Amino acid sequence: MDEPSTDKILIGAQIITTVITLFTGVFEFIIAAKSKMKRMKSEQMFSVNQDGLIHIIKSLLPGRNIIFISNAPTSTTDPSFNSQTMKNFLKVIFRLLPFFIGAVFIHLNIIPFHHLIIFTENGKWYFDSIQEELIPIVKERLKQIMSSQPDVIFACGAVVRDIFYMYLEEGSIEMFEINGNLKVDINKFKKIYTTVSDKNISPQSNEILDLFEFDTTKSSYEDVIEEYSKFENDSLGSFENPDYSGFHLLSKRKWNNKEALIVGIGKSNNKTTVQIKGDLLDKGYFRTELAIDTYFDRNKVLINKMVKNFKSTQEIIKPSPVISGNWSLDEQKALMVEVSTLGNKSEINWFFISKQLFLKGISRNARECQRKHESIQYVGLSGNPKGKFKRTFD
């Protein structure tokens, strides 16, 4: 028998095995649900959770340690079994469906085990491959974060990739469902690895100027880091590629015992200090509120103009380049801005690209930028553009 025929037989056998496993898992799921209903009948309480689908997925991936991390509810409880309870039940199943699909794909060897991550972003599903060479880099960084034993690690969008790497061990698989609409109680965090959006935590604009300044005329990373290290509580990070000497460094500060991130965005009279104020949502880069204009005196007119032209019904406005009159293209990075809305909340997203990429034109989607341009200098909590730059947050 020739090799292609053998492959077809193997694929067919895998499909048959998968179908049998699925039917068995679904049958066991139904039996378990009925049993649970009987047990809880006296309490007049019907509870639905993810146990059934997790059981099916574990059946598809025997011997593998499966951990589910979701910031969306994966269970529902109702005083009685009614139509609303069934709707909630279906919602739970729908939320877990990406996990199920991924398990099937791995079981059929459609997607390599170590190359799978599944998460949702604004209701859309993404299948994202992982570059193997990045795994040890990001794993090490995340291990340093975890060594501080934070109470909560909150991640959305592209940041999920980093956390996925950290848990990536032989014989284990991590899957995530991420909902960008998650509202976070900031007081539940022991440490916050993002900027802060709570007005009670953020400093006033005049406080920012006292926190962080560095001379952007320094010629090398070593010089910048030396000056940068003069400030307490800074997280300097680790820089692998000296060619990024013009990249703006990140700093952490503590306000009211909470940590936040500061980003220098260029220079005015050789020194600039700007805090980007925002919360980590679904894009993997900084989401900043419209109130940010109070921190950008030089760009205030421009931002107010953008806000005035912004329509709340628009999901995303195409980004516009922002270059201060005091900045020269030879000296500065280009700053891209886009305005978006999440529910009834309007936000401005800031991120940086190199002058060269700016002049060539670049996609407005930061994730696409990371994929298409190896050299992009991209400011976002997920951090490293294609692994060429990394930092720690411990």
From Swiss-Prot:
Source species, domain of life: Eukaryota
Signal peptide stretch: none
InterPro entries, sorted: Homeodomain-like_sf, SANT/Myb
Membrane topology type: Multi-pass membrane protein
Location(s) in or outside the cell: Membrane
Keyword Transmembrane attached: yes
GO cellular component terms, A-Z: membrane
S-S pairs: none
Keywords of this entry: Membrane, Transmembrane, Transmembrane helix
Transmembrane segments: 11-31, 99-119
Protein name as annotated: Myb-like protein R
Annotated source species: Dictyostelium discoideum (Social amoeba)
Taxonomic lineage from the root: Eukaryota, Amoebozoa, Evosea, Eumycetozoa, Dictyostelia
UniProt gene name: mybR
